[in-house]
Amino acid sequence: MIDGDGYRLNVGIVICNNHGQVFWAKRYGQHSWQFPQGGIDEGETPEQAMFRELYEEVGLTKKDVKIIATSRHWLRYKLPKRLVRWDSKPVCIGQKQKWFLLRLECDESRINMQRGKSPEFDGWRWVSYWYPVRQVVSFKRDVYRRAMKEFASLAMPFRERKTKGKRKKQQRRG
């Protein structure tokens, strides 16, 4: 779905583990990495699109994750002119995204990028929380920075709680 300004309505997905790391996926047949994302179909809510994309791209279902947060606003980025398909109607000049922060609630062995019709990714790894902001393709960087900044206080407690628990145990041994 493309809005009146030429932006494709889309969802972005940040999956966090209990160590405060995020899921980082390698685009199929390429050397570029990104978060899972995908378009919102006609009649679909952003949350429905997120769960559909999560399954198609990562193989996870609603019961495998917990929604921690949704971005307050739509975040937009423009495509570089070389990537705009000028011959398609309507012309899409960029993405307008609603972002979701999810916590993985299942074992990571459930991740399966072969469930969709054509795989979007052919590799993945856990990376530190801020790593994607520095590593994503430049035209998406500001949107990533804004989404990650908005989610930081909600994602970081997973890591901090685990670390604090270890410190308390170590202090008791003392």
Curated annotation (Swiss-Prot):
Q: Does the keyword Hydrolase apply?
A: yes
Please name the HAMAP family in this protein's record: Nudix_RppH
Tell me the organism: Vibrio parahaemolyticus serotype O3:K6 (strain RIMD 2210633)
A single GO molecular function term of this UniProt record:
mRNA 5'-diphosphatase activity
- What does this protein's UniProt record list under function? Accelerates the degradation of transcripts by removing pyrophosphate from the 5'-end of triphosphorylated RNA, leading to a more labile monophosphorylated state that can stimulate subsequent ribonuclease cleavage.
What does the record give as cofactor?
A: a divalent metal cation
Would you tell me the protein name for this molecule? RNA pyrophosphohydrolase
A single Gene Ontology biological process assigned to it is: mRNA catabolic process
